[in-house]
UniProtKB/Swiss-Prot annotation:
GO terms for molecular function: metal ion binding; squalene synthase [NAD(P)H] activity. It is a multi-pass membrane protein. Gene3D superfamilies: Farnesyl Diphosphate Synthase. Keywords: Cholesterol biosynthesis, Cholesterol metabolism, Endoplasmic reticulum, Isoprene biosynthesis, Lipid biosynthesis, Lipid metabolism, Magnesium, Membrane, Metal-binding, Multifunctional enzyme, NAD, NADP, Steroid biosynthesis, Steroid metabolism, Sterol biosynthesis, Sterol metabolism, Transferase, Transmembrane, Transmembrane helix. SUPFAM superfamilies: Terpenoid synthases. It comes from Mus musculus (Mouse). Signal peptide: none annotated. This is Squalene synthase. Catalyzes the condensation of 2 farnesyl pyrophosphate (FPP) moieties to form squalene. Proceeds in two distinct steps. In the first half-reaction, two molecules of FPP react to form the stable presqualene diphosphate intermediate (PSQPP), with concomitant release of a proton and a molecule of inorganic diphosphate. In the second half-reaction, PSQPP undergoes heterolysis, isomerization, and reduction with NADPH or NADH to form squalene. It is the first committed enzyme of the sterol biosynthesis pathway.
Length: 416
């Protein structure tokens, strides 16, 4: 199937091949772990087990910020594992979430009652908390604060539905916006980035909301099948009586209309995303922040006006993901990528869609205010001979490429 997808996108196949043959190391270099303590090595092992995608970009970060963000990620992954575990009673879960930040200072605390797939980060939490206490105080302060605020926010929604659009923003702030705020404060504390990066809470929050809303939109069917509801009732309630009924074939038209409205809401975070990325100076930090954002806009474009969201999984192509990862290394390239995908959405807006005017307005504003000089990326320079060579190479090499690292696919799977 991936071979067939590549037939229409030879440049993506070329990038897949280049990535597999060593191009990955040009922007995600392998980290030398020989000098690490055994506990820190274990932390990186857990990082790779829970998220290969984040592991790759975290390990490419410069200096001591790399270890701080590794620990930050694992602490929040442990917290998130408690939130996701439906086998934990509400009575037990709420105090666990609210008090989780205090466990960072308890060398013995661990939780062995989880049934979740990532439960090892709870069962071996002493290893993670040890490395937390080994961090510089400036990093500990940020991680403690974000963990505390996130735990309390998660507790608020344990037994509460996402009803209004304000609730949606609030929930996404707790589970993702705070991550963006925490990362930004860590970047500034490390002095790799200017103080404004950590001080502008609104832009940092939007970075997280853009990613989280994209995940929630794309994962409608998976969440429904697992009994989770993250789409705001204020929106879907205008289209249908029960959220789960969007999956019924007879409701596909109103389902897509609701989908388009939520995507339009999410696109409004793009100006803040561009402002945030434009302030970054360290290349490794820029890559770390930019790659998920361009993956998100590509995912939104794939989901827009797409009935498949309610029937199965919508994912961007592996070659597309690799191309985005390799291209999104500077601000002009990121702007061009975002312009490309918002134009793709714009040209697919149905005139009959209830949100069509709003969607056009949002995209036009982004074009004018944030992307005034951008043009669509053209790859028409590939000659017929070159294309023929690519296709032949594809046929000969596909079996080899089928073993491509999962790092690219993880970027388009939900992060918990």
């Amino acid at each position: 199937m991936e071979f067939v997808k590549c037939l229409g996108h030879p440049e993506e196949f070329y990038n897949l091949l280049r990535f597999r043959m060593g191009g990955r190391r040009n922007f995600i270099p392998k980290m030398d772990q020989d000098s690490l303590s055994s506990s820190l090595k274990t932390c990186y092992k857990y990082l790779n087990q829970t998220s290969r995608s984040f592991a790759a970009v975290i390990q490419a970060l410069d200096g001591d910020i790399r270890h701080a963000i590794c620990v930050f990620y694992l602490v929040l992954r442990a917290l998130d594992t408690v939130e996701d575990d439906m086998s934990i009673s509400v009575e037990k879960k709420i105090p666990l979430l609210c008090n989780f930040h205090t466990f960072l200072y308890d060398p013995e605390w661990r939780f062995t009652e989880s049934k979740e797939k990532d439960r090892q980060v709870l069962e071996d939490f002493p290893t993670i908390s040890l490395e937390f206490r080994n961090l510089a105080e400036k990093y500990q302060t940020v991680i403690d604060d974000i963990c505390h605020r996130m735990g309390c926010g998660m507790a608020e929604f344990v037994d509460k539905d996402v009803t209004s659009k304000q609730d949606w923003d609030k929930y996404c702030h707790y589970v993702a916006g705070l991550v963006g705020i925490g990362l930004s404060r860590l970047f500034s504390a490390s002095e790799f980035e200017d103080p404004i990066v950590g001080e502008d809470i609104e832009c940092a929050n939007s970075m997280g909301l853009f990613l989280q809303k994209t995940n929630i939109i794309r994962d409608y069917l998976e969440d429904q099948q697992e009994g989770r509801k993250f789409w705001p009732q204020e929106v879907w309630g205008r289209y249908i009586k029960k959220l789960e009924d969007f999956a019924k074939p007879e409701n596909v038209d109103v389902a897509v209309q609701c989908l388009n409205e939520l995507i339009t809401n999410t696109l409004q975070h793009i100006p803040d995303v561009l402002t945030y990325l434009s302030r970054l100076r360290n290349q490794s930090v820029f890559n770390f922040c930019a790659i998920p954002q361009v993956m998100a806009i590509a995912t939104l474009a794939a989901c827009y006006n797409n009935q498949q969201v309610f029937k199965g999984v919508v994912k961007i192509r592996k070659g597309q993901a690799v191309t985005l990862m390799m291209d999104a290394t500077n601000m002009p390239a990121v702007k061009a990528i975002i312009y490309q995908y918002i134009e793709e959405i714009y040209h697919r807006i149905p005139n009959s869609d209830p949100s069509s005017s709003k969607t056009k307005q949002v995209i036009s504003k982004i074009r004018t205010q944030n992307l005034p000089n951008c043009q669509l990326i053209s790859r028409s320079h590939y000659s017929p001979i070159y294309l023929s060579f690519i296709m032949l190479l594809a046929a000969l090499s596909w079996q080899y490429l089928s073993t491509l690292s999962q790092v690219t696919e993880d970027y388009v799977q939900r992060e918990h």
